[in-house]
Amino acid sequence: NFSVFAMSADGDAKILYYTGRNKAIVWSGEELGAKLAQEDPSFHFSRVEANVGAPQVNYRQSGGQGQFADITVRFEPMDPGSGYEFKMLEPIMKRGQINSFGDKPGGLK
């Protein structure tokens, strides 16, 4: 659970309070944004000591081995107002690797 305490003027960096770990975290899309936020006095919400270390990026693979794929997508024009249509190769569906998409409204056909 995160709460936003402060945001840099350009919106690139934020100070988040992480209640699960009782920590304030400087978040930025890139390392430079975090460094600039650290040096910008208008960015700080209070005078606190900061432990500055290397950026931490958490990578998690939740589906086990083989869940990531190299995908090729082909786009083709359709008649105006006809909506959208997704098609996939039948052998993949038969193996059950992505069967959770097939029976949902607007799902794969």
UniProtKB/Swiss-Prot annotation:
Annotated keywords: Chloroplast, Elongation factor, GTP-binding, Nucleotide-binding, Plastid, Protein biosynthesis
An example Gene Ontology molecular-function term: translation elongation factor activity
Record's keyword annotation contains Plastid: yes
Domain of life: Eukaryota
Subcellular location: Plastid, Chloroplast
Pathway where this protein functions: Protein biosynthesis; polypeptide chain elongation
Any one annotated GO CC term: chloroplast
UniProt-listed InterPro entries: Ribosomal_Su5_D2-typ_SF, Ribsml_uS5_D2-typ_fold_subgr
Predominant subcellular localization, coarse grouping: plastid
Known function: Chloroplast-localized elongation factor EF-G involved in protein synthesis in plastids. Catalyzes the GTP-dependent ribosomal translocation step during translation elongation. During this step, the ribosome changes from the pre-translocational (PRE) to the post-translocational (POST) state as the newly formed A-site-bound peptidyl-tRNA and P-site-bound deacylated tRNA move to the P and E sites, respectively. Catalyzes the coordinated movement of the two tRNA molecules, the mRNA and conformational changes in the ribosome.
UniProt family annotation: Belongs to the GTP-binding elongation factor family. EF-G/EF-2 subfamily.
Name of the protein this chain belongs to: Elongation factor G, chloroplastic
Source species: Arachis hypogaea (Peanut)
Lineage: Eukaryota, Viridiplantae, Streptophyta, Embryophyta, Tracheophyta
